[in-house]
């Protein structure tokens, strides 16, 4: 039996495959809006495991699988009790007998890896505490819709060194953009992601000054200062205040720079209303493109592209 095609991290999928997924996502978006989209996954079932609650991830994967012709099965963390009542390996083997693919959103990256190690069907990373690759696929798709090829462009991050940033860092090596980051002291991204990107051709630069990171950028990205279920890490929002994306900071970037945020946004904290509701903001295009990018991730994993 051939090994399943998992989508665990950008570092685990080659650049050609990532580009194939994005090309397919663009085509599926057009076909969906035209009412001509095919349904290649009729009769297929996607299990969705949510140890960490979500609106966008659940809805986008559910709707996406249905648009592909398949069905979904929602499993909450309390229902699954991964690694408690039963080993994760055994759960993976059992689910593989019932469904055709598994998406998991978890607070522990090791659970994702263990699930994929034992599953005989594709496993998709819907988000972990370490990475969020599906979000970056949607973000690159969105950037290229508005500004053309991302290769050679500069994407600037300001805020916390979190899971979304880790995937952006990996993406710099996979898609060829320059990644600049500004984070408070002590909130830096993990070295393993930085080192991997540098060793694989990524151009990355880390600052503790938002003005330096954003200067001349083609896109400015931020996220909530404290992620869900990580409130214990909060050391006072005052340390993040200099990293707020406001009109003054956006003025440091290119005049036509885009603003991105994976949502939900804490307005008045990491971003002001003037920016998120302004003409440079594409946050709702990002949210929509989660649907289309993830459809193509599912299709790639299941061998129909």
UniProtKB/Swiss-Prot annotation:
Write down what this protein is called.
Ornithine carbamoyltransferase
* Gene (name only): argF
Q: Which organism is it from?
A: Agrobacterium fabrum (strain C58 / ATCC 33970) (Agrobacterium tumefaciens (strain C58))
Q: Which GO terms describe its cellular component?
A: cytoplasm
Q: Which HAMAP family match?
A: OTCase
* Location relative to the cell: Cytoplasm
Q: Which GO terms describe its molecular function?
A: amino acid binding; ornithine carbamoyltransferase activity
Q: Where does L-ornithine bind?
A: 163, 223, 227-228
Q: Which InterPro entries match?
A: Asp/Orn_carbamoyltranf_P-bd, Asp/Orn_carbamoylTrfase, Asp/Orn_carbamoylTrfase_sf, Asp_carbamoyltransf_Asp/Orn-bd, Orn/put_carbamltrans, OTCase_ArgI
> PANTHER family given for it?
ORNITHINE CARBAMOYLTRANSFERASE, MITOCHONDRIAL (PTHR45753), ORNITHINE TRANSCARBAMYLASE, MITOCHONDRIAL (PTHR45753:SF3)
GO biological process: one example? L-arginine biosynthetic process
């Amino acid at each position: 039996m051939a090994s399943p095609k998992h989508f665990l991290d950008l570092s685990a999928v080659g650049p050609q495959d990532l580009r194939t997924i994005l090309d397919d996502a663009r085509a599926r978006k057009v076909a969906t809006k035209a009412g001509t989209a095919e349904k290649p996954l009729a009769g297929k079932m996607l299990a969705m495991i949510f140890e960490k609650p979500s609106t966008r991830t659940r809805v986008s994967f559910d709707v996406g699988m249905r648009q592909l012709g398949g069905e979904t099965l929602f499993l909450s963390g309390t229902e699954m009790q991964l690694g408690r009542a039963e080993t994760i390996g055994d759960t993976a083997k059992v689910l593989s007998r019932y469904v055709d693919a598994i998406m998991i959103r978890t607070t522990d990256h090791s659970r994702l890896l263990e699930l994929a190690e034992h599953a005989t069907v594709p496993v998709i990373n819907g988000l972990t505490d370490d990475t969020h690759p599906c979000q970056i696929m949607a973000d690159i798709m969105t950037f290229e819709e508005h500004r053309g090829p991302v290769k050679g462009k500069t994407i600037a991050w300001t805020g916390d060194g979190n899971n979304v940033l880790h995937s952006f860092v990996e993406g710099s090596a996979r898609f060829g953009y320059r990644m600049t980051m500004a984070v408070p002291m002590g909130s830096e991204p993990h070295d393993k992601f930085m080192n991997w990107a540098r060793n694989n051709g990524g151009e990355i630069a880390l600052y503790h000054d938002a003005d330096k990171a954003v200067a001349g950028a083609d896109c400015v990205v931020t996220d909530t200062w404290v992620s869900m279920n990580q409130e214990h890490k909060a050391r006072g929002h005052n340390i993040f205040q200099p990293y707020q994306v406001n009109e003054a900071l956006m003025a440091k970037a290119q005049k036509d720079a885009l603003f991105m945020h994976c949502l939900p946004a804490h307005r008045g904290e990491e971003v002001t209303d003037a920016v998120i509701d302004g003409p440079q903001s594409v946050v709702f295009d990002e949210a929509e493109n989660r649907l289309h990018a993830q459809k193509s991730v599912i299709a790639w994993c299941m061998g129909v592209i």
